[in-house]
Amino acid sequence: MFNANEQVSSRDIVLCLDVSGSALPYDREVIQAYLNFIEHFQGERIGLSIFNSTSRTVFPLTDDYRLAKKQLQYAANLLGGVQSQSRINRLQQRQYQEISDWLEGTQNRKNATSLIGDGLVSCAAMLPGFIYGSAHNNHKIQSRFNRSSSIVLATDNVVSGKQTYSLKQALDLTKQAKITVDGLYSGAKQNENDDATLEMKQLIESHGGIFLSQRNSDSVINLVKEIEKRHTAIPQGAAQSAFSDDPGLWVLLTVFSVVIWLAIAKRMKR
């Protein structure tokens, strides 16, 4: 049927996961939260990037939810085996290899792990209009429907090695590009009040994002709900007219057109 005011979703979401040894056991909760929530997506695009010393795009921005769910479910199944030392001890060689294959490409720099700023910039590069270097991001090119962009950054903010971008520099770039970055602490509960965690909280919030610790039982779901609530408003101009895929409508229109054409042709013969 014809809908003169069909709303087009305007959200792009990148899941940006730290897969260093200290953060990897907690990533499954983030993935599982989005697996549950993706059921309610209608036109949103979602992508997944993982990083340690270097980054790998697991899947780019897509609204192919079948593909996204398949990739997220596979990752959730894999990471279920590394959530505790006892589970790690029970892994078979095949499972070790599958996890290693999934992480391939994230540790290409020697003597460096968990380069948070670099990982965040790589995640931002998945979003339309982001350009490396601060001079250009003030002029971010907006897509046709002015899509909003957000990143969910899950990390414990424990850096080891020299970064190209600090977390602050990366957040400055994303803010200039009008990309919202929300932070999720992915680390051991006893380290929640460490300087690195408090610094991450301060930087995320000062750049307009939400910071939560996923050690609270429902905090991952709360973060997801807050992101969804933030982006539910459709920008002006995002409504468009559209025909649904209804063959009955096209048959009626075709018949109507033929009738009109025959009437005109008959009148012209007179």
Where is each model-derived feature located?
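C-terminal signal-anchor/stop-transfer transmembrane helix together with its immediate cytosolic
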Residues: M1-N3, A233-R270
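…and closely analogous acidic/polar surface helices at protein-protein or active-site interfaces
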Residues: E6-I13, G21-N52, F59-Y74
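Residues that scaffold, gate, or flank divalent-cation-dependent active/transport sites
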Residues: D18
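Extracytoplasmic/secreted cell-surface and envelope-processing proteins
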Residues: L24-Y26, R56-P60, V159-T164, N191-D195, ...
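Sec-exported extracytoplasmic/periplasmic mature domains
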Residues: L35-I46, Q73-G80, A124-Y132, K175-Q176, ...
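Short beta-strand-loop
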Residues: I46-E104, A196-K201
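VWA/integrin I-like adhesion module and closely mimicked acidic/polar interface patches used
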Residues: Q107-S114, D118-M126, F130-S150, A154-Q202, ...
